[in-house]
Amino acid sequence: MNQSVKRIDVKGPHGTWSYESPSWIDRFPIVMGDTYRHGGVSKAPYESLNLAFHVGDEAQSVRENRAIIVKYLGVEPNRISCGNQVHGLKAVEITEDLVGAGAFGEDTAIDDCDAVFTNLPHVPLFLFTADC
C-alpha cells in the first residue's frame, strides 16, 4: 500500500472488515473510504460485505451489511443516501428531503444518478464501483 492511502481494519460481528481511505482526508471533518468484500453476512457469490441491492443479493443481507458500516460511523442506517447509477453525468445534492433515498432498497434510490453530494452532517453517501 502506498503512503497516500491508509487501510483501516474494523472488528465486526461477522469478522474483520476493512476500508481504505486517502491519507489527506484526515484534514477534513469527513470520513471517506472504499470497503473490501470481507466481514459481512452475504452468501456466495456475493460474500460477504456486499452493499448493493442491484446485483441479485438477498435484500436483508445488504441491509445488514450496510448496518455494519454505518454502526462504525455512528450513523443510523435510514440516513444512507444513494442513487441508481447509470454511467451518466447526473450529480444530485442530497438535501433533507432526499436523506435516506436508497437506504433500504433499490426502488427508493435516486433515479439516473451517478454522483451524490451533501453539506448535511451524519449522512452517509454510498457509491458503487466494480472491478470490471
Where do the model's predicted regions map?
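Active-site microenvironment for binding and transforming phosphate-containing groups
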Residues: 1-132
